[in-house]
């Protein structure tokens, strides 16, 4: 019976697929064994990617309704690229919202209503000839991803309709195809019933954004296959069961031959059978199979050969498989008999230029970056990914939570409050078919990937009977995997939906409370460590739970990549834009930028902490040797080389490499083989220990460091006193105090109340005098907990102070000048800054904060520092500090004490909104030099200090919402701090920095540093 399209389907919850073919596995198939072994692009597929003709309408009423008719000429239309988003190719505009629906405030709607006047329509046309090898064969079309709903016509005839943006939609074109030119028409709507189910935290696009291709099938064809590669209870026998659904042009006998090859190409098992049915199951077993895990992703290759009744080979299907067993044992998730810990990250499919159109190269870069930084798991937040992603996870080794395309966040949570009065799907069983369709489509496509350990019922959609039934479906069709859903946290009546306790952004204490109160399920954080801007502070508090509580089984950082889009400012310069930058309203602004890599895929400084805390092998050195703790479940350390290095005051003394063997789940203490000489000098020693790859791997080259540990110790006392010799001349002017030595002069101003000149060899170093600084440019997390509101008085105190006293003391060998400052915020806050000038031209600076009386009434300090400016020519930095990447009090676990160089402009991290960045803790020395290697050196004296050196002041950064708003660079701004508060990261909407990383206003603070000329 012929079906006619109807635009009313867009708002009909009962219509989500018309004439769409049943979902099936994502296997490939070939005509010969030789092809199947090489797996080239399939000859029975023909890509329709590329330029299509295109028309854009702002709503259905203005679309060209009859464009699909053969007599309607579309060849003069514009071109658009497929795959691609409409909004990134010059039509409409991208919009970013998090939880609210994109029409909020413009239309008052309830499901399944959609806006009538704001529903952009993209009309696509592709003219094609059927490839010769597909002529006289069945012809099908596959759309791998179309957002959010679309209609298809071929040669004027209606073909079908589909919703669900993130799983394939396939249709039979055979009845409509003709010889010669065919006219394929696709009408894509941005809003549909499906829009209510796709309220994920991402940019709202529309269009054909994944591959489109034609395909044909042979006379005997594996339409669907379900490969179950399991293990028996002893884990010693692999049980391979493959269920096939066949398509046959004639109901004649089929011979199926199955051959299983190991990774070296040897046949390890075979089976064959004959069948007259459309369903068949082929079984075989393997003794002592190599097992699949993220540590060692061993894949076998199954070849299925289909012969017709004459014995002619018709089709060959290659399929990679991994033997593994994933299950709950005594309320603990185990893989191949071992307790697993997910060291994971959430990943949106994203490219800063093309949005959710990602290439294989993008995927490879992501997976290699993850592996290099010890990430072992990924959650496909919050929709099924491009099919190729799972193949790469199988091959490279990543554990996957595969999440169905469901999020209805705006239907139950408003402004952070749980209010589910009109939540969908909830218990509204009329929504079950459209929701279940998404679950079925994901399962059927992805079911054969060993990397997928867990099915997820979606994200942030509250809970109810519908989602519970989705969970029951997954369990009924696939007992080899577990089921995840976090939303039951808000509705415990549906707790059975999830096999694990899953929470978002729970504090470490809350997690411990769960784990110490008779837990019934293992715990994972499906989202934690909200990595928005300068964040990820305190991550160690979560990873420390891994060995403390067996039922704590890890978590997934939010998230992998900044969802920021390249845009040009008014002068044509590119920058990464966020919500609102395209005139999109409503919007959630920069909340889209939460990545541990930037939108250009370069790792952010936060990745330094991730790599260290996610190490599977821990190196714990002391002065005599190193404890190697191999926390891998299945692999020993034979693939790595141990390297250890001894440094004295940052200078390398000794280095050695050796092989090391530590079995999985074991630890070994290895003594160092040091040379005796050079180890008794007074000073600071640092031992670095590293494990590096012996050979190239798929994901990294030989020499890549997989694990690191360090030990710092001191020999002898710290040299605090200066013994510089020479004469100093002191000039007491009416306004200034001048101190002069050989080839240098220092000037202190009574009027300014500070050091105003430091003149070395005819060059002025001070462009702006040092002043107390209490403020840092607010980070995204600071903004989330209203730091400017609560602690804004320190912003004011940093801009205005009063020098109430100046004292000068002349002694043999040095001259001291002490300034005392008061602040309008409180008459009980006092800061003293003392400068001691020595005959060699060096200065010792001591800064003291006192507020012991009355300080308890003041808010916490963002930092306690001195800030001054040098000329911008001093832009070369040489550090001996914790690094090499930026680090903070609560994000320094992964930093190492080392020497490194960078430029001032590079110290500013590339967060999409300017904010505090570039800090280094544990600073011993930092040289600030010009191109000739001249300048100053800032050195700690009693305790290591913190330094942040930037082209901009905290206040310039504070006032800018985008990098292009920052002024031209005129100075090098030096902030030397005794302490700065941590950056936090439990969440970005109110979670405070943990207490031990906060600067309380009622504590006395002091730091000391030297300024030396270079």
UniProtKB/Swiss-Prot annotation:
Its EC number is 3.2.1.23. The keyword Hydrolase applies. The active site is at 460 (proton donor), 527 (nucleophile). One of its GO terms (biological process) is lactose catabolic process. PANTHER family: BETA-GALACTOSIDASE. It comes from the Bacteria. Keywords: Glycosidase, Hydrolase. This is Beta-galactosidase. Belongs to the glycosyl hydrolase 2 family. It catalyses: Hydrolysis of terminal non-reducing beta-D-galactose residues in beta-D-galactosides. The gene is lacZ. One of its GO terms (cellular component) is beta-galactosidase complex. One of its GO terms (molecular function) is carbohydrate binding. It holds the Pfam family Bgal_small_N.
């Amino acid at each position: 019976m012929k079906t006619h399209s109807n635009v009313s389907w867009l708002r009909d919850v009962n219509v989500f697929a018309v004439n769409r073919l049943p979902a099936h596995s994502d296997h490939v198939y070939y005509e010969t064994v030789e092809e199947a072994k090489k797996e080239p692009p399939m000859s029975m597929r023909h890509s329709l990617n590329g330029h299509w003709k295109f028309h854009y309408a702002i709503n259905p009423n203005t679309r060209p309704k009859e464009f699909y008719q053969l007599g309607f000429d579309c060849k003069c239309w514009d071109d658009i690229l497929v795959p691609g988003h409409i909004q990134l190719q010059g039509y409409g505009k991208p919009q970013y919202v998090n939880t609210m629906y994109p029409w909020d405030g413009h239309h008052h709607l309830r499901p399944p209503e959609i806006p009538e006047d704001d529903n952009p329509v993209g009309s696509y046309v592709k003219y094609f000839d059927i490839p010769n090898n597909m002529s006289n064969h069945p012809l099908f079309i596959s759309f791998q991803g179309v957002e959010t709903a679309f209609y298809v016509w071929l040669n004027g005839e209606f073909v079908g309709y589909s919703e669900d943006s993130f799983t394939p939609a396939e249709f039979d074109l055979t009845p409509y195809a003709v010889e010669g030119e065919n006219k394929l028409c696709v009408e894509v709507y941005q809003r549909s019933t499906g829009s209510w189910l796709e309220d994920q935290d991402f940019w709202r696009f529309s269009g054909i954004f994944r591959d489109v291709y034609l395909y044909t099938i042979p006379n005997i064809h594996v339409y669907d296959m379900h490969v179950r590669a399991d293990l028996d209870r002893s884990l010693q026998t692999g049980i391979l069961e493959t269920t096939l659904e066949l398509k046959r042009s004639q109901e004649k006998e089929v011979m199926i031959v199955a051959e299983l090859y190991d990774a070296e190409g040897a046949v390890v098992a075979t089976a064959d059978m004959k069948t007259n049915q459309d369903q068949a199951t082929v079984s075989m077993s393997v003794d002592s199979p190599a097992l699949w895990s993220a540590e060692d992703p061993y894949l076998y290759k199954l070849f299925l050969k289909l012969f017709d009744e004459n014995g002619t080979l018709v089709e060959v299907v290659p399929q990679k498989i991994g033997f593994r067993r994933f299950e709950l044992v005594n309320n603990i998730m185990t893989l191949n008999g071992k307790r697993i810990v997910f060291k994971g990250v959430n990943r949106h499919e994203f490219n800063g230029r093309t949005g959710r159109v990602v290439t294989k190269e993008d995927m490879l870069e992501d997976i290699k970056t993850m592996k290099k930084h010890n990430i072992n798991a990924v959650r496909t937040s919050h929709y099924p990914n491009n099919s190729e992603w799972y193949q790469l996870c199988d091959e490279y080794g990543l554990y996957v939570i595969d999440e169905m395309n469901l999020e209805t966040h705006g239907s139950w949570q408003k402004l952070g409050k749980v209010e589910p009065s009109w939540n969908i799907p909830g218990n509204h069983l009329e929504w079950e078919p459209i929701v279940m369709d998404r679950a079925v489509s994901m399962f059927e496509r992805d079911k054969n990937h060993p990397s997928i350990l867990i099915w997820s019922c979606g994200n942030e959609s509250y809970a109810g009977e519908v989602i519970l039934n989705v969970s029951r479906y997954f369990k009924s069709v696939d007992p080899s995997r577990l089921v995840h859903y976090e939303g039951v946290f808000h509705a415990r009546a549906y707790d059975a939906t999830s096999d694990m306790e899953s929470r978002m952004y729970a504090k470490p204490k809350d997690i411990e409370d769960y784990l110490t109160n008779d837990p019934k399920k293992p715990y994972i954080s499906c989202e934690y460590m909200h990595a928005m801007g300068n964040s990820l502070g305190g991550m160690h508090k979560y990873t420390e739970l891994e060995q403390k509580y067996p039922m704590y089984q890890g978590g997934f950082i939010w998230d992998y990549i900044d969802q920021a889009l390249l845009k040009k400012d008014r002068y044509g310069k590119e920058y990464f834009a966020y919500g609102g930058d395209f005139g999109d309203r409503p919007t959630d602004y920069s909340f889209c930028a939460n990545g541990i890599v930037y939108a250009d895929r370069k790792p952010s400084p936060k990745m330094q902490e991730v790599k260290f805390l996610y190490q599977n092998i821990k190196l714990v050195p002391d002065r005599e040797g190193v404890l190697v703790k191999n926390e891998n479940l299945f692999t020993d350390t034979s693939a790595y080389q141990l390297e250890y290095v001894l440094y004295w005051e940052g200078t390398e003394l000794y280095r050695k490499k050796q092989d090391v063997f530590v079995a999985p789940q074991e630890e070994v203490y290895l003594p160092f083989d040091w040379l005796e000489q050079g180890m008794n000098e007074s000073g600071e020693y640092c031992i670095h220990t590293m494990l590096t790859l012996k050979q190239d791997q798929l994901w990294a080259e030989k020499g890549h460091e997989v694990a690191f540990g360090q030990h710092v110790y001191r020999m002898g006392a710290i040299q605090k006193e200066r013994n510089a010799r020479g004469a100093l001349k002191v000039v007491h002017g009416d306004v200034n105090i001048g101190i002069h030595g050989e080839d240098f002069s220092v000037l202190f101003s009574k009027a300014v109340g500070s050091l105003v000149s430091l003149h070395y060899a005819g060059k002025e170093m001070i462009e702006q005098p040092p002043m107390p600084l209490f403020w840092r440019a607010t980070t995204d997390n600071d903004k989330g907990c209203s730091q400017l509101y609560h602690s804004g008085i320190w912003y004011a105190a940093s801009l205005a102070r009063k020098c109430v006293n100046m004292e000068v003391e002349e002694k043999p060998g040095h001259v001291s000048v002490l300034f005392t400052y008061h602040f309008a915020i409180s008459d009980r806050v006092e800061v003293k800054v003392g400068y001691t000038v020595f005959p060699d031209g060096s200065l010792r600076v001591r800064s003291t904060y006192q507020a012991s009386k009355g300080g308890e009434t003041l808010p916490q300090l963002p930092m306690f520092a001195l800030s001054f400016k040098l000329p911008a020519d001093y832009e070369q930095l040489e550090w001996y500090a914790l690094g090499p990447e930026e680090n903070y009090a609560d994000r320094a676990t992964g930093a190492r004490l080392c020497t490194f160089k960078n430029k001032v402009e590079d110290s500013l991290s590339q967060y999409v909104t300017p904010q505090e960045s570039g800090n280094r803790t544990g600073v011993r020395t930092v040289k600030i030099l010009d191109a000739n290697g001249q300048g100053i050196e800032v050195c700690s004296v009693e305790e290591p200090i913190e330094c942040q050196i930037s082209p901009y002041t905290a206040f310039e950064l504070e006032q800018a919402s985008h990098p292009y708003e920052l002024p031209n660079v005129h100075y090098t701004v030096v902030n030397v701090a005794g302490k700065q508060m941590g950056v936090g990261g439990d969440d970005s909407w109110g979670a405070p920095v943990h207490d031990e990383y906060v600067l309380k206003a009622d504590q006395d603070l002091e730091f000391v540093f030297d300024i030396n000329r270079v």
